[in-house]
A protein has these predicted regions:
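Phosphate/pyrophosphate-binding active-site segments
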Residues: 2-15, 148, 184, 302-389, ...
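Generic recognition of flexible, low-complexity loop/linker segments
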Residues: 158, 203-205, 230-231, 269-271, ...
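Active-site diphosphate/adenylate-binding microenvironment
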Residues: 20-33, 38-41, 46-48, 350-432
Length: 540
C-alpha cells in the first residue's frame, strides 16, 4: 500500500459540436424537418447519424427533387431544404430551379463539393466555381471560405430566401466540412415583410378612389402573401372588375365571384383590347405585363392610367409606365381598406355564364373541355390541383374554376417538369387533403419519376394525364410564327406512349379512359383512393 491518494477517474470530454450538429440545430430553429434530395458521395457525411425526427424525401432525379421541394415550400409557406450532388446534380435540377425562382419559392439548395484539400487538383466530382453555377436564378449563392462558416451561411441563406420577394438560395458545401468543429448559432428573429411607403400608398389609394371604371389585374403574389381575403374586399369596395394576370401561377381571386372577369392572355394587343373601357388599371401583385410573343403599341388602353402594387422592386423597375408601390401586399391591402370609403359606383356587368362542354359523338375522342368539366363536376372545391397541361390551360380556365384559396398551383416559368413532383410536395405539406396532378402527356415525361416518390410515400394523389399524343401547345402556337394550317411542326408528335404501364413500373395503380361514358366513374374512384392513382384520359 502506498502513501499516495487514489487518482480520480478521468472525466470524459463532451464531443465537440460539428458543422453537422450546428446545421441540424439551425434547421430545427427554422421549423424544418425534411430534406429533399438524391444523394451522392459528396453528400453522404451530411446524413451520417441523421436525426430520427427528420425525414429524407428521395427523388430519383434532381429535377424531381427540386419540384417536390417547390410544391412543399409553397404549400407550407416555409423554406424547403434541398440537397443535390455536386455540379452534375445542380445541372440536372436547373430547369426546376429556374421555375422555383420564377415561382418566388423559398428554398435552400445545398450541393456537395469535393474535399477542400484536393480542390486545387481538379478532382473527380469537383465543382469549378460552384457558387456561380446556379446564377442568376438564385437570390444568393456562396461556397463558404471555411468549414466553420457553413452554419452562418445556412442561416443567412434561410433569411434571404424568406425575405420578400422570396426565392431559392444556394450553398456549396465541401464533403469534409461536416465533421469539422463549429459553434451553435443563437436563435434570432428577423422580420420578413416591409410595409409600403405610406405617402406612395396614399397616392395609389387616391387614384383608386377617383377612378370611374377601375380594373384589377391580380397576380400570384397576392395568394403568396396571404392576401386573398383582402383582395376580395378591396375589389368589392371599389366595385372593380377583376382579371387574372397573364401566366399567373396561383389562384388569387375566387373564379365564381360576380366581379371576376376572366384571364388576360400574354399578348400585348389582346390585353389592351380586354381592358378597353377601364380608366384605371391596378396591377395588384402582378407584373404589368407578362408577354409571350412580340407586340406593339400601348401597354394599356389609350386614356387609361396604370398603377401597380408589388412586393418585388425588380418588377416595379421594369414596368414600362405608371406609378408603382413596393411592399408587402397584405399589409398594403389592409392599409387601403382602412381608408375612408370611396364614392359609390355601379356594379359592373357580370361575366357571361360558362357554357358546358358536350360529350363526343360516337367514335370520336372526347375533348379536353369535356374531360376537365367532368373533373370539375366530381372534384371537391377544397381539393388541390397542380396543373402542367399548357395546351389545356385556356380550356381549364373555362371549365375547371377555382373558388378557394390554396387550391391551385402551376409554374410561373413556362418550363416543363414541375407539375408531377410539385404535386408530391404539396401532398406532403397538406396531409389529409386530396391532391390532383393535372398533367399533359408531354409534360409528364420530364419528371415521370415523381410517381415512384408518390408511391413510396403512399400519398393520396390523383394524377390525371391528358393524352392527346402530341405537344399540342406547340402545334397550336405554330401559326403565330407563320406556319400554315397543314404545315408539319417537327418534333411535336408523341405516339406509342403507355402511361398505365409507366405508372405500374413506378409502383402506382393506373387506368386508361377512352370512353367518355366511363370517365366520371373512373375519376370518382380515383379521387377516393388512399394512395396515388394515374388516370390516363385519351383526348382529341
Amino acid at each position: 500500500m502506498t502513501g499516495h491518494p487514489p487518482s480520480a477517474a478521468p472525466v470524459p470530454h463532451a464531443a465537440p459540436t460539428t458543422v453537422r450538429d450546428a446545421v441540424i440545430d439551425l434547421l430545427r430553429q427554422f421549423g424544418i424537418d425534411r430534406v429533399f434530395g438524391n444523394p451522392g458521395s459528396t453528400e453522404l457525411p451530411m446524413f451520417r447519424d441523421f436525426p430520427a425526427d427528420f425525414q429524407y424525401v428521395l427523388g430519383l432525379q434532381e429535377a424531381v427533387v427540386v419540384g417536390m421541394a417547390d410544391g412543399y415550400a409553397q404549400a407550407t409557406g416555409n423554406a424547403a431544404v434541398v440537397n443535390l450532388h455536386s455540379a452534375a446534380g445542380v445541372g440536372n435540377a436547373m430547369g426546376n430551379l429556374f421555375t422555383a425562382f420564377k415561382n418566388r419559392t423559398p428554398m435552400i439548395v445545398t450541393a456537395g463539393q469535393q474535399a477542400r484539400a484536393i480542390l486545387p487538383f481538379d478532382p473527380f466530382l469537383g465543382a469549378t466555381q460552384a457558387a456561380e453555377m446556379p446564377k442568376p436564378y438564385v437570390k444568393w449563392s456562396i461556397e463558404p471560405a471555411r468549414a466553420q462558416d457553413v452554419p452562418a451561411a445556412i442561416a443567412r441563406a434561410y433569411r434571404i430566401a424568406m425575405q420578400e420577394p422570396r426565392g431559392p438560395v444556394f450553398v456549396s458545401i465541401p464533403v469534409d466540412d461536416w465533421d469539422q468543429p463549429a459553434d451553435l448559432l443563437p436563435p434570432r428573429d428577423v422580420s420578413r415583410v416591409v410595409r409600403p411607403d405610406p405617402a406612395a400608398l396614399a397616392r395609389l389609394g387616391d387614384a383608386l378612389d377617383a377612378a370611374r371604371r377601375p380594373a384589377f389585374v391580380i397576380g400570384a403574389a397576392v395568394e403568396r402573401a396571404g392576401a386573398w381575403q383582402q383582395a376580395v374586399q378591396l375589389a368589392e369596395r371599389h366595385r372593380a372588375r377583376v382579371y387574372v394576370a397573364p401566366m399567373s401561377g396561383r389562384c388569387s381571386f375566387p373564379e365564381d365571384h360576380p366581379l371576376f372577369a376572366g384571364f388576360l392572355p400574354a399578348i400585348r394587343e389582346k390585353i389592351v383590347a380586354r381592358l378597353d373601357g377601364h380608366d384605371l388599371i391596378f396591377a395588384f401583385g402582378a407584373p404589368a405585363f407578362t408577354y409571350h410573343v412580340e407586340g406593339f403599341g400601348p401597354h394599356v388602353p389609350p386614356g387609361a392610367t396604370l398603377v401597380q402594387l408589388v412586393d418585388d422592386p425588380g418588377v416595379a423597375a421594369w414596368t414600362p409606365e405608371g406609378d408603382a408601390v413596393v411592399g408587402n401586399l397584405r399589409l398594403a391591402a389592409l392599409d387601403l381598406l382602412a381608408r375612408a370609403a370611396p364614392p359609390e359606383r355601379p356594379m359592373p356587368e357580370p361575366r357571361a355564364p360558362r357554357t358546358r362542354a358536350q360529350p363526343p359523338a360516337a367514335g370520336e375522342r372526347m375533348s379536353a373541355a369535356f374531360a376537365l368539366q367532368t373533373l370539375a363536376d366530381v372534384r371537391d372545391a377544397h381539393d388541390i390541383v397542380i396543373e402542367e397541361a399548357p395546351s389545356a390551360r385556356p380550356v381549364m380556365q373555362d371549365h375547371l374554376p377555382f373558388t378557394q384559396s390554396g387550391t391551385f398551383y402551376t409554374m410561373d416559368s413556362g418550363g416543363l417538369g414541375y407539375g408531377m413532383p410539385a404535386a408530391v410536395g404539396v401532398a406532403l405539406a397538406q396531409p389529409g387533403r386530396r391532391v390532383i396532378g393535372l398533367i399533359g402527356d408531354g409534360s409528364s415525361l420530364y419528371s415521370i419519376q415523381a410517381l415512384w416518390s408518390a408511391a413510396q410515400l403512399r400519398l393520396p394523389i390523383t394524377f390525371v394525364i391528358l393524352n392527346n399524343v402530341r405537344y399540342a401547345a406547340l402545334q397550336d402556337f405554330a401559326p403565330v410564327f407563320g406556319f400554315g394550317p397543314d404545315d408539319p411542326v417537327q418534333g411535336t408528335d408523341l405516339p406509342n406512349l403507355d402511361f398505365v404501364a409507366l405508372a405500374a413500373g413506378m409502383g402506382c395503380r393506373g387506368g386508361r379512359v377512352s370512353d367518355a361514358a366511363r370517365l366520371r366513374g373512373t375519376l370518382v374512384d380515383a379521387l377516393r383512393a388512399p394512395t396515388p392513382v394515374v388516370v390516363e384520359i385519351e383526348i382529341a
